[in-house]
């Protein structure tokens, strides 16, 4: 069990705000952390890793990582950290990057096998693709068998095909080792696929906490589905009006009435929902 109760004043793009997080994470849980940019997600991960100071307490099992009397340095926290930028040693091979963390050839071989990197063990990082580098980074983070694995948008720089592959490998590693994991992500499909729980941060505080289905699937009453998107344009096609809306990485077209169109402004956030298979915009 990990118990987090921390406070820290932040100076973000929207002005000063207080990061105030009080949450418990069960052992073996894979938790997704989401929310707008500047809401405190990365700062929370850095505090957990001991890379930034904060007030409050962090208790992992029976050990305090942070309280009034102590703040354990990063190397004593048994943390695995996966960044967006890989952070590999360029002068070491794939295998050497792993063994540098811990001289455990058996564990290294197992991690490379799970992530399908065995044939690349002697390769240097400069010869690898972005997806391969991130898989090496993930394996290296697991070499010390961390009590807590932190991943800060680890798949954000990858294309959709490689993202899907790494999602499956993250799940395979999690199923194999059962490591408690906190992953920052903005992708609903990624969160739904990987996480057992999702927390939404807004201006430094938790505004939603639950299963991915409960938090991300915005349904209401008899609605079949509801998605938030950005209105890009309203165009006239023959005798009907069509709204062009960006939802995630896709564009959708929704027929709107004249009265609906009068109340819509290009650039605004809208909800696209359906009742009895008839999409509506709100």
Short names for language-model regions:
Residues 124-128, 132-134:
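Conserved ABC ATPase signature
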């Amino acid at each position: 069990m990990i118990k987090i109760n921390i406070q820290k004043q932040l100076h973000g793009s929207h002005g000063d705000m207080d990061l105030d997080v009080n949450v418990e994470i069960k052992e073996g849980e894979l938790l997704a952390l989401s929310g707008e940019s500047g809401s405190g997600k990365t700062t929370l991960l850095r505090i957990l890793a001991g890379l930034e100071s904060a007030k409050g307490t962090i208790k992992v099992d029976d050990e305090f990582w942070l309280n009034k009397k102590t703040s354990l340095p990063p190397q004593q926290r048994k943390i695995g950290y996966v960044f967006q930028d890989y952070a590999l040693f360029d002068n070491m091979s794939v295998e050497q990057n792993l063994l540098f963390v811990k001289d455990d050839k058996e564990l290294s071989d197992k991690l490379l096998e799970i992530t399908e990197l065995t044939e690349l063990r002697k390769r240097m990082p400069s010869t690898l693709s972005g997806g391969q580098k991130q898989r090496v980074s993930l394996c290296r983070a697991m070499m010390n068998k961390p009590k807590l694995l932190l991943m800060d948008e680890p798949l954000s720089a990858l294309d959709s095909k490689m993202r899907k592959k790494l999602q499956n490998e993250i799940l395979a590693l999690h199923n194999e080792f059962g490591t408690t994991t906190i992953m920052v992500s903005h992708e609903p499909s990624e969160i739904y696929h990987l996480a057992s729980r999702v927390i939404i941060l807004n201006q430094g505080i938790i505004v939603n906490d639950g299963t991915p289905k409960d938090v991300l699937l915005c349904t209401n009453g008899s609605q079949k589905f509801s998605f938030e998107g950005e209105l890009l344009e309203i165009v006239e096609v023959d005798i009907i009006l069509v709204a062009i809306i960006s939802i995630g990485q896709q564009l959708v077209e929704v027929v709107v009435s004249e009265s609906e169109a009068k109340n819509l402004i290009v650039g605004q956030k809208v909800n696209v929902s359906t009742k009895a298979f008839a999409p509506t915009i709100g």
